[in-house]
């Protein structure tokens, strides 16, 4: 028994965890396979951020259990950290359950089933990401304690990862031809607060000093902690794409305080103005929660007005999900699902209009694009203003001789609500 596969659910941080597990197991001589039916060991990296994520994880486990036969089914990640005993009781087909950050325990477990096999350590690099980009996790955990979020209980307090290891990982990927590195953590603005004399600005400067042609993208910046130094660094460094993902969650101060969030609408507007003045070409992305307990219709409409005023380039919306163990779980004034759905749909419809207008404004302009996938007669690419998996894409039709992971110059020819079309020039 030496073949394994990994099914990854949830956020980019889980993607990184899966990649590290794959690397560790291949170095131990196990073989990564993409097809479930060829695997002796099936790993499922789970998520429990909201109810939909929990349901998706459980559905994936049940599907794997149904076709298990003589395979070993191993579940790890956030859901199993939080509900490990319940999973083992309710789904007896599961052979082992691990939490987060237990890679060494997983390796010890899997090795016991192959004691008599002759293993050869592999130098092949398998990945759960395309050949164009890699997520780079720069910190683990979170100490924010937002009232709607279970992450601190699952992943622990915020810990910055070793900068030398981060730089080494990126440098190795640059040498292998990767063209984009997406820095992720629950809140990257906190990076370095627990290190002596090493800050996020220093990390960005050190990353940009690595020789090579690549992009650096920043995801998940806490709005109140984006300072002038960080804005200046992003503006000055050519390798950092002018794209900021700033989850604001709401515009109204009363709701923000119930959420355990800092900041006010006035402060947010001031910060956005400051960023756009310093970086005129910046793409701003944010996420918001609708239907948080006690959110009134007036507060929701003021949120809609705020979104209209700011004109975010990219926007994500979540319907509030009641999570056990969070402070918001016991709040009175829970919003009915039909109201959440209506509010969600209204914001998404408004944002679709904004997005269409912004995408049509790109028509006739030339950009550098990074190709993620080649599929039949089309290629899927992204501009600096597109983060993978969460934003739209560029659809290219003249794809002869193109390769995934390649950068090309393109002309935008059509714009839609979320995607654009282009041709290579």
Curated annotation (Swiss-Prot):
Binding site for [4Fe-4S] cluster 1: 11, 47, 78
Binding site for [4Fe-4S] cluster 2: 142, 146, 149
Gene Ontology biological process terms in this record: tRNA modification
Keyword flag Cytoplasm: yes
InterPro entries documented for this protein: Elp3/MiaA/NifB-like_rSAM (IPR006638), Methylthiotransferase (IPR005839), Methylthiotransferase_CS (IPR020612), Methylthiotransferase_N (IPR013848), Methylthiotransferase_N_sf (IPR038135), NA-bd_OB-fold (IPR012340), Ribosomal_uS12_MeSTrfase_RimO (IPR005840), rSAM (IPR007197)
SUPFAM superfamilies for the chain: Radical SAM enzymes (SSF102114)
Protein location: Cytoplasm
GO MF, one example: metal ion binding
Domain Radical SAM core: 128-357
Superkingdom of the organism of origin: Bacteria
Pfam families: Radical_SAM (PF04055), TRAM_2 (PF18693), UPF0004 (PF00919)
Entry keyword set: 4Fe-4S, Cytoplasm, Iron, Iron-sulfur, Metal-binding, S-adenosyl-L-methionine, Transferase
Cofactor binding comment, as recorded: Binds 2 [4Fe-4S] clusters. One cluster is coordinated with 3 cysteines and an exchangeable S-adenosyl-L-methionine.
Major localization class: cytoplasm
Entry's EC annotation: 2.8.4.4
General function of this protein: Catalyzes the methylthiolation of an aspartic acid residue of ribosomal protein uS12.
Family statement: Belongs to the methylthiotransferase family. RimO subfamily.
Protein name, entry field: Ribosomal protein uS12 methylthiotransferase RimO
């Amino acid at each position: 028994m030496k073949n394994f596969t990994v099914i990854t659910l949830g956020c980019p941080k889980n993607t990184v965890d899966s990649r590290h597990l794959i690397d560790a197991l291949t170095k131990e001589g196990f073989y990564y396979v993409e097809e479930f039916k060829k695997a002796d060991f099936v790993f499922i990296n789970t998520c429990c951020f909201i109810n939909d994520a929990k349901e998706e994880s459980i559905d994936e486990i049940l599907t794997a259990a149904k076709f298990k036969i003589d395979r070993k089914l191993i579940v790890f990640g956030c859901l199993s950290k939080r509900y490990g005993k319940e999973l083992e009781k309710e789904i007896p087909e599961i052979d082992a359950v691990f939490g987060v950050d237990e890679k060494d325990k997983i390796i010890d477990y899997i090795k016991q089933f192959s004691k008599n096999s002759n293993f050869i350590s592999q130098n092949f690099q398998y990945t759960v990401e395309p050949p164009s980009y890699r997520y780079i996790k720069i910190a683990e955990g979170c100490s924010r304690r937002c009232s709607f979020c279970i992450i601190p209980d699952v992943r622990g307090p915020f810990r910055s990862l070793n900068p030398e290891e981060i730089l080494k990982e990126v440098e190795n990927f640059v040498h292998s031809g990767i063209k984009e590195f997406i820095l992720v953590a629950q809140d990257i603005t906190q990076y370095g607060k627990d290190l002596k004399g090493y800050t996020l600005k220093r990390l960005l400067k050190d990353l940009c000093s690595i020789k090579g042609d690549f992009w650096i993208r920043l995801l998940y910046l806490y709005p109140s902690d984006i300072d002038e130094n960080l804005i200046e660094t992003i503006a000055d460094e050519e390798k950092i794409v002018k794209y900021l993902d700033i989850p604001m969650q709401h515009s109204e101060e009363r709701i923000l305080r119930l959420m355990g969030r800092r900041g006010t609408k006035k402060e947010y507007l001031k910060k956005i103005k400051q960023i756009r003045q310093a970086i005129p070409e910046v793409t701003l992305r944010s996420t918001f929660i609708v239907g948080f307990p006690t959110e009134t219709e007036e507060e929701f409409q003021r949120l809609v007005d705020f979104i209209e005023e700011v004109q975010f380039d990219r926007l994500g919306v979540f319907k509030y999900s009641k999570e056990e163990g969070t402070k918001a779980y016991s709040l009175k004034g829970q919003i009915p699902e039909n109201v959440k759905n209506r509010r969600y749909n209204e914001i998404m419809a408004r944002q679709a209009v904004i997005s269409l207008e912004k995408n049509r404004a790109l028509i006739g302009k030339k950009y550098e694009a990074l190709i993620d996938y080649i599929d039949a007669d089309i290629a899927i690419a992204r501009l600096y203003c597109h983060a993978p998996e969460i934003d739209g894409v560029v659809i290219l039709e003249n794809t002869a001789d193109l390769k995934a992971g390649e950068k090309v110059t393109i002309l935008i020819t059509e714009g839609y609500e979320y995607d654009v079309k282009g041709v290579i020039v």
